[in-house]
């Protein structure tokens, strides 16, 4: 089974959105038994909380429910548990790289590297600035690219 962890700052906006979108795509493609998903934050402020209501609303508008997810903090042992650890932005990437064992660096990626057509490396944080629908669009595009990569690398 291939395992994927999406990571942002607080695990209440971008990473649960990415987990929900990717989980929905995986289920739609009939791969739920082959790919496991989770999300986490580099910070600890929101542990145990559900996704931001605006993120849930943006997902709901597209037929995806992320209300069951709960925030947790990323830990070094996640690099042992997940094949893909995906940072939403450069700051998240630096924080994750600082806890990543050297022999697991190949598991750490920028999420938008799977969507070069977006033309950005960072998924913007909509918590203060808004833009949940634009973030959702980026996440959908990157999720399709990620699934294509997983299919290619893992023969799914």
Feature map (PLM): residue ranges:
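Conserved active-site segments centered on acidic
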Residues: 1-81, 148-156
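Hydrophobic structural packing positions in well-ordered secondary structure
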Residues: 8, 59, 86-87, 139
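Helix N-cap/beta->alpha junction signal
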Residues: 15, 89-90
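Phosphate-binding/catalytic loops
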Residues: 84, 90-156
């Amino acid at each position: 089974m291939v395992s994927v962890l999406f990571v942002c700052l607080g695990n209440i906006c971008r990473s649960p959105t990415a987990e929900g979108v990717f989980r929905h795509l995986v289920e739609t493609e009939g791969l739920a038994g082959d790919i496991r998903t989770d999300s986490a934050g580099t910070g600890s402020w929101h542990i145990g909380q559900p996704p931001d209501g605006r993120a849930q609303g943006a997902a709901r508008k597209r037929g995806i429910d992320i209300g069951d997810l709960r925030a947790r903090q990323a830990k070094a042992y996640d690099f042992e548990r997940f094949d893909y650890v995906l940072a939403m932005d450069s700051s998240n990437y630096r924080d994750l790289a600082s806890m990543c064992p050297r022999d697991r660096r190949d598991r750490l990626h920028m999420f938008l590297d799977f969507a070069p057509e977006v033309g950005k490396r960072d998924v913007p944080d909509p918590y203060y600035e808004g833009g949940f629908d634009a973030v959702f669009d980026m996440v959908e595009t990157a999720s399709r690219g990620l699934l294509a990569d997983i299919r290619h690398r893992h023969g799914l």
